[in-house]
A protein has these predicted regions:
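N-terminal helix-turn-helix DNA-binding module of bacterial transcription factors
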Residues: 1-56
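Alpha-helical recognition/docking segments in bacterial nutrient-uptake
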Residues: 2, 58-163, 230-231, 235, ...
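Short beta-strand segments enriched in small/hydrophobic residues
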Residues: 19, 55-71, 172-182
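Alpha-helical structural signal in soluble globular domains
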Residues: 41, 84, 88, 192-204, ...
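Hinge/beta->alpha junction and helix N-cap segments in small-molecule ligand-binding domains
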Residues: 69-75, 100-102, 150-160, 176-227, ...
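Periplasmic-binding protein-like
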Residues: 110-117, 174-177, 212, 233-244, ...
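Flexible loop/turn connectors
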Residues: 231-332
Length: 332
């Protein structure tokens, strides 16, 4: 595993700076460019290269991004997928251009295929579908639009997380789920992991005491919600399941400020396994989503679609897995 020193050396900054950036230290004064470089180096060192032959002649792919640069820094999930896309495109010699939907070149399209990364409203989908090119939607189930998609089996990940907590004696569980809107503010996006949580809860033989909290999918979102929640009276659950590692980082900060020890006083389990999760204190137990591989696979799948005259709409689903580290305590 790469160390803080490895990241610092490649990013050309001090180990202390790396540590503070990876832990989202708000008192640190460094540029967004430096933060971006550190996060990208952390992703790069976390990546295991796969040797594949480069094709001689490849077309151009347009990547439509949902997140902007600042949002990528707040939640590394989409940064990691994007880097996987860029890495695979470079490996195969594919020309890749990147834009946000607001800059979508409808009247000046030179690409041969489109990868759309993120969540999109009906209005936004109508814009994208005006272009008669092969398309692949990543992290967005576009089957109802008759478009190919590549998604994560969030339900399976939720089951793994919650079964692990119960196996360790936790029957009082809080869930911090995320809330977000499409970029045009036309649609609220439900957190499918909260829905999966409810289905899991309904199937349990033993009663599960549940506390439900909602925040933005950011470090600060998790921090603010947990900080306010801790001010409330009453007993607290023995464990928190948090549907994104970014919110989990904010949660850890709020708990530390309240002198609540993780995992001795409260256990934490996250979701995504972003590159900084292993560097937190304690190292975060989380559900690993193969984000880099999703990015790589999206390039390969789109290239395959480009060579097919007729295709049946396909949804590819990836299974996440539990990464056991240090943030969950056994009560047995």
């Amino acid at each position: 595993m790469a160390t803080i020193k490895d990241i610092a050396k490649q990013a050309q900054v001090s180990p202390a700076t790396v540590s503070r950036v990876l832990n989202y230290d708000k008192t640190l004064s460094v540029s967004d460019e430096t933060k971006q470089r550190i996060f990208e180096v952390a992703e790069e060192l976390n990546y295991t290269k796969h040797q594949k032959k480069t094709l001689k002649k490849m077309p151009e792919i347009l990547l439509i991004q949902w997140y902007n640069q600042q949002e990528e820094l707040e939640d590394l999930y989409y940064l990691s997928i994007r880097m996987g896309i860029e890495r695979k495109a470079k490996m195969l010699g594919v020309q890749l251009s990147v834009c946000q939907l607001s800059d979508f070149p409808i009247d000046n399209m030179t690409a041969d295929g489109i990868i759309a990364l993120g969540k999109f409203s009906k209005r936004e989908m109508a814009i994208i579908q005006r272009i008669a090119l092969p398309k692949l939607f990543v992290d967005f189930d576009s089957m109802s639009y008759q478009e190919h998609s590549l998604v994560v089996d969030f339900e399976f990940g939720v089951i793994q997380a919650l079964d692990y907590l119960v196996a360790n004696g936790h029957y009082s569980i809080g869930i911090l789920s995320g809330q977000e809107k499409t970029k045009d503010n036309q649609e609220i996006i439900a957190d499918s992991r909260l829905q999966a949580f409810h289905r899991w809860q309904s199937q349990q033989e033993h009663a599960i005491d549940v506390v439900e909290l909602v925040a933005d999918f950011t470090v600060d979102g998790g921090y603010q919600v947990i900080k306010e929640w801790l001010k409330q009276t009453g007993s607290k659950p023995s464990a928190l399941f948090i549907t994104s590692d970014a919110m989990a980082i904010g949660t850890l900060k709020a708990l530390e400020e309240a002198n609540i020890s993780v995992p001795m006083d409260m256990s934490i389990i996250g979701f995504n396994d972003i590159s900084v999760a292993k560097y937190l204190s304690p190292a975060l137990t989380t559900i690993q989503v193969p984000t880099e591989w999703m990015g790589e696979q999206s390039v390969e799948e789109l290239l395959a679609l480009m060579t097919q005259e007729k295709t049946i709409t396909k949804k590819t689903m990836f299974a996440p897995k539990l990464m056991i580290r240090e943030s969950v305590r056994t009560l047995l």
